[in-house]
């Protein structure tokens, strides 16, 4: 299996452009469009694989911003996007599509790609922080039958599902049984209600959490995302090097 890769894109649009809060669907569409432009056969294969896609991406990270009712206003028009996958074929095709015109359209907003940078994979993990929220669900029995219930860290099922989900993705990607394990402790979390597309909403969690256990399994979560719906922009994390980060207020970019 090929080496993993994570990239940072520095994007530029007009000053004072307003970005919608729920822009994950637009980003997912933009990513697929770029891949399809570069390699239609790979894009079709990726789209048709129903179980796991093995990539994730962040929400747009807008550092100079004003929060408006209709969305986030970019003061200087600059935003950052992070994309990660355990398979370079995905990243290579996305970058190839991006190089065709150097643009990325997010809904009605057109960004120009100013810079693209490959980021190194950390040698160790301790504290992780989400840059797109983690989504998990379970099924519960009701009088009307089985219903989908979105999980947050205040439910013990959240912890079980997060670990099991990561191991299942690892087994599917490497086509081998995963005997590795990891544990985690949630240091801070903030519940979010996000619109996936149209009128479909979900409850998810922005988190800072401590991890320990088998490095390769944690690294795989870092590469392809923790939790479900990674390919829709959920579950991307960054490694927090500052050991005092857990005592700081959790700042949300979106």
Curated annotation (Swiss-Prot):
Enzyme class of the recorded protein, top EC level: hydrolase
The organism's place on the tree of life at top rank: Archaea
Q: What is its EC number?
A: 3.1.-.-
Q: Write out the catalytic residues in the record.
A: 32 (proton acceptor), 47 (proton donor)
Q: Which lineage is the organism of this entry classified under, starting from the top rank?
A: Archaea, Methanobacteriati, Methanobacteriota, Methanomada group, Methanococci
Q: Which family does it belong to?
A: Belongs to the CRISPR-associated protein Cas6/Cse3/CasE family.
Q: What is this protein called?
A: CRISPR-associated endoribonuclease Cas6 1
GO MF annotation terms? endonuclease activity; RNA binding
What's the gene?
A: cas6a
Task: Look up the record and give one Gene Ontology term from the biological process aspect.
Answer: defense response to virus
Recite the UniProt keywords alphabetically: Antiviral defense, Endonuclease, Hydrolase, Nuclease, RNA-binding
Originating species: Methanocaldococcus jannaschii (strain ATCC 43067 / DSM 2661 / JAL-1 / JCM 10045 / NBRC 100440)
Q: What does this protein do?
A: CRISPR (clustered regularly interspaced short palindromic repeat) is an adaptive immune system that provides protection against mobile genetic elements (viruses, transposable elements and conjugative plasmids). CRISPR clusters contain sequences complementary to antecedent mobile elements and target invading nucleic acids. CRISPR clusters are transcribed and processed into CRISPR RNA (crRNA). This protein processes pre-crRNA into individual crRNA units.
Q: Which Pfam families match?
A: Cas6_I-A (PF21350), Cas_Cas6_C (PF01881)
């Amino acid at each position: 299996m090929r080496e993993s890769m994570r990239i940072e894109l520095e994007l530029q649009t007009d000053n004072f452009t307003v970005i919608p809060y729920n822009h994950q669907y637009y980003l997912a569409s933009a990513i697929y469009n770029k891949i399809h432009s570069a390699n239609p056969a790979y894009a079709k294969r990726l789209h048709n694989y129903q179980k796991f896609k093995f990539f994730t991406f962040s929400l747009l990270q807008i550092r100079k911003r004003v929060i408006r009712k209709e969305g986030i206003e970019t003061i200087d028009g600059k935003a950052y996007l992070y994309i990660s996958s355990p398979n370079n074929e995905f990243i290579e095709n996305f970058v190839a599509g991006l190089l065709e015109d150097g643009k990325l359209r997010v809904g009605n907003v057109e960004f120009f790609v100013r810079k693209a940078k490959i980021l190194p994979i950390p040698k160790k993990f301790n504290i992780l922080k989400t840059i797109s929220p983690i989504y998990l669900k379970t099924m519960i029995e009701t009088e009307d039958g089985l219903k989908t219930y979105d999980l947050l860290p205040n439910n013990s099922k959240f912890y079980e599902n997060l670990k099991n989900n990561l191991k299942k993705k690892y087994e599917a990607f490497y086509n081998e049984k995963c005997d590795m394990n990891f544990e985690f402790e949630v240091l801070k979390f903030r519940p979010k209600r996000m619109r996936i597309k149209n009128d479909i909403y979900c409850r998810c969690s922005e988190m800072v959490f401590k991890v320990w256990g088998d490095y390769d399994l944690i690294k795989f979560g870092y590469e392809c995302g923790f939790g479900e719906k990674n390919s829709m922009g959920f579950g991307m994390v960054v490694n927090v090097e500052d050991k005092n980060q857990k005592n700081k207020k959790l700042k949300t970019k979106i």
